[in-house]
């Protein structure tokens, strides 16, 4: 009774952490919506996650593996979230990407239909059904958890953790640890293997982060004063007026010139009158 209670608590915590992981690409898709263009983003990982969620939902059903409701809930939520992501991606993709997505989605649907029919018609016990679907879950779960290996190799080559966010690595580690613990309380090898590998890969990311954090180029600070505020203000101040006489205006200059020109004529007129 106590192990079951602990297992349920751990499973609920795992649901919460996994939900956070499913929501982590939201900023990416918000950017796609704002730009109305997928640009260089790829839908591959979301298509893979969709298939992975479908397999785990099927695995957790009572007709396949009883007492796995917490596996069904989180992967059912993940299935809906991934479907929303792919819908957004489809709406803002070009014809080539839409065609590719359509082919992959149709293939995944046919694959799941074949798995469901094959398991339900051929395997007549929970143990055999769990074995078949569990092996498929391990294969696709391992592929998904090993996807950060490409990013890790990039970190080693560039000696920079710029494209490996610390928070995502920490949450991935906690998620794998939580679900591994869940699987060990009532031993389930099919949940243990992919999540145990997830813990290992996330731990490797954290180690790499600790090694290469100091060698990562720092981004220019955007929290300092506005660039205009750093411009040196002019020290010029108007000088006080000169004690000399003020300059004549154009009007007074013209008046003075006219008076000077008239003075000889006035002198001659005065001489005649005399």
UniProtKB/Swiss-Prot annotation:
Membrane topology (Cytoplasmic): 30-45, 90-100, 152-164, 210-274
Domain MtN3/slv span(s) in chain numbering: 9-96, 132-214
Superkingdom of origin organism: Eukaryota
GO terms, biological process: carbohydrate transport
Region (Disordered): 218-274
Database matches in Pfam families: MtN3_slv
Annotated Low complexity bias: 245-258
GO cellular component term, pick one: plasma membrane
Any one Gene Ontology molecular-function term assigned to this protein's record: sugar transmembrane transporter activity
Residues annotated as transmembrane: 9-29, 46-66, 69-89, 101-121, 131-151, 165-185, 189-209
Segments on the Extracellular face: 1-8, 67-68, 122-130, 186-188
Similarity field: Belongs to the SWEET sugar transporter family.
Role this protein plays: Mediates both low-affinity uptake and efflux of sugar across the plasma membrane.
Stated name of the protein: Putative bidirectional sugar transporter SWEET7d
Organism: Oryza sativa subsp. japonica (Rice)
């Amino acid at each position: 009774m106590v192990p079951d209670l602990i297992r349920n608590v751990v499973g609920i915590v795992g649901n919460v952490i996994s939900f956070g992981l499913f929501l982590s690409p939201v900023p990416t898709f918000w950017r796609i919506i704002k730009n109305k263009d997928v640009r260089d983003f790829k839908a591959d990982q979301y298509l893979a996650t969709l298939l992975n969620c479908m397999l785990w939902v099927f695995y957790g059903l009572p007709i396949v593996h009883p007492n796995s409701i917490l596996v069904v809930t989180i992967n059912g939520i993940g299935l809906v979230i991934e479907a929303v992501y792919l819908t957004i991606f489809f709406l803002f993709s070009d014809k080539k990407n839409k065609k590719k997505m359509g082919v992959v989605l149709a293939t995944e649907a046919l694959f799941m239909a074949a798995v469901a029919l094959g398991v339900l018609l051929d395997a007549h016990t929970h143990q055999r059904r769990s074995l078949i679907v569990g092996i498929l879950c391990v294969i696709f779960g391992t592929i998904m958890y090993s996807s950060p290996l490409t990013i890790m190799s990039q970190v080693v080559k560039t000696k920079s953790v710029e494209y490996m966010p610390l928070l995502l690595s920490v949450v991935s580690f906690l998620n794998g640890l939580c679900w591994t613990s869940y699987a060990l309380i009532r031993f389930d090898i099919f949940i243990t293997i992919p999540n145990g590998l997830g813990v290992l890969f996330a731990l490797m990311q954290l180690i790499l982060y600790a090694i290469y954090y100091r060698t990562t180029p720092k981004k220019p600070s955007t929290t300092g004063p506005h660039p205009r505020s750093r411009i040196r203000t002019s020290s010029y101040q108007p000088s006080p007026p000169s004690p000399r006489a003020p300059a004549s205006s154009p009007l007074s200059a013209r008046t003075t010139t006219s008076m000077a020109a008239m003075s000889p004529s006035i002198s001659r007129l005065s001489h005649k009158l005399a």
